Amino acid sequence: MTRIKNNGISKKKRKRKISKMKGWVGGHSKLFRTGNQQLMKARHYAFYDRKKKKNLNKTLWITRINGGLKYYLTINEKYNIFVSFLRKTKTYVNKKLLSEINVRDSKSFSHLSKPIMKSTGINL
């Protein structure tokens, strides 16, 4: 019985990985070991930064909503108080939607916010 080597499969794996390393500087694009290390690192950063991007977007939305509350309603209420008022009045709107309403159509944001704040007892 002849000995079977994985030469063809190994070459195929290496070729696939090296094709993803194109455009990198130095040995990272030419040498397999250093390129493979760089590829693993790049994948790790890609995963980490996808999570980080979501967190940054959430903070941006909260900042926009908070700014809209201060500017259009002329109150110094914080975002978390506003959200608790939304929950008390059973108005379910997510952060992204509130932020987009504030940016694109600020008058409708103030019209949306005023009845909620009045129903909870805050004088505007």
UniProtKB/Swiss-Prot annotation:
InterPro entries to which the protein is assigned, alphabetical: Ribosomal_bL20, RIBOSOMAL_L20_CS, Ribosomal_protein_bL20_C
Origin superkingdom: Eukaryota
Keywords associated with the record: Chloroplast, Plastid, Ribonucleoprotein, Ribosomal protein, RNA-binding, rRNA-binding
Biological process, per Gene Ontology: ribosomal large subunit assembly; translation
Gene Ontology MF terms: rRNA binding; structural constituent of ribosome
Localisation per UniProt entry: Plastid, Chloroplast
GO-annotated cellular components: chloroplast; ribonucleoprotein complex; ribosome
Chief place of localization: plastid
Protein's UniProt keywords contain rRNA-binding: yes
PROSITE patterns linked: RIBOSOMAL_L20 (PS00937)
Family to which the UniProt record says this protein belongs: Belongs to the bacterial ribosomal protein bL20 family.
NCBIfam families in the record: rplT_bact
Role noted for this protein: Binds directly to 23S ribosomal RNA and is necessary for the in vitro assembly process of the 50S ribosomal subunit. It is not involved in the protein synthesizing functions of that subunit.
Name this polypeptide is given: Large ribosomal subunit protein bL20c
Organism encoding this protein: Euglena gracilis
Organism ancestry: Eukaryota, Discoba, Euglenozoa, Euglenida, Spirocuta
